[in-house]
């Protein structure tokens, strides 16, 4: 395994200090309302977010950031695509924490940007295949949502791992498609997930930031 790939794996690890564990992407609301109540419904919910929501849009933004597209313009797109205040907070806070940590490790100048753009700027010099970077990012995103479901549904640890494993084929497909997608392909249709993010903003009892 190359040093470049190991660096990317480290950056996308749950141990990397982006605070990802504190964000449920609206999943907490879906669980509290009974829409996500077991491993099967968690898998469906997360698969839809990956294929039709932020998973896909972030993957396309990341692909273009890796290829050197204007990071300022990509950041504006990322912000515009956030369907709720908490989603915007989620991508900006994690992106800022990610950029600050990678900058401290590498000595590079990495300004705070939405997470997919920050990751793309950081990972571009690694020279890794675009689809491979996208797949690892999507896997990290899915793993974080599965972790939220394990804690809050709750699911058993083995159920959680089985849920994540079942998403692997779809992650590979989305990564391959997004690696070649133009910016004109940006858009989402995860309407229930977007509504969950909006409803979470006024949820009285919660343990996640989003």
Curated annotation (Swiss-Prot):
The keyword Cytoplasm applies. It holds the Pfam family UreF. GO terms for cellular component: cytoplasm. One of its GO terms (molecular function) is nickel cation binding. The keyword Cytoplasm applies. It is found in: Cytoplasm. InterPro entries: UreF (IPR002639), UreF_sf (IPR038277). Keywords: Chaperone, Cytoplasm, Nickel insertion. Coiled coil: none annotated. UreD, UreF and UreG form a complex that acts as a GTP-hydrolysis-dependent molecular chaperone, activating the urease apoprotein by helping to assemble the nickel containing metallocenter of UreC. The UreE protein probably delivers the nickel. Required for maturation of urease via the functional incorporation of the urease nickel metallocenter. Belongs to the UreF family. This is Urease accessory protein UreF. It comes from Cereibacter sphaeroides (strain ATCC 17023 / DSM 158 / JCM 6121 / CCUG 31486 / LMG 2827 / NBRC 12203 / NCIMB 8253 / ATH 2.4.1.). The lineage of its organism: Bacteria, Pseudomonadati, Pseudomonadota, Alphaproteobacteria, Rhodobacterales.
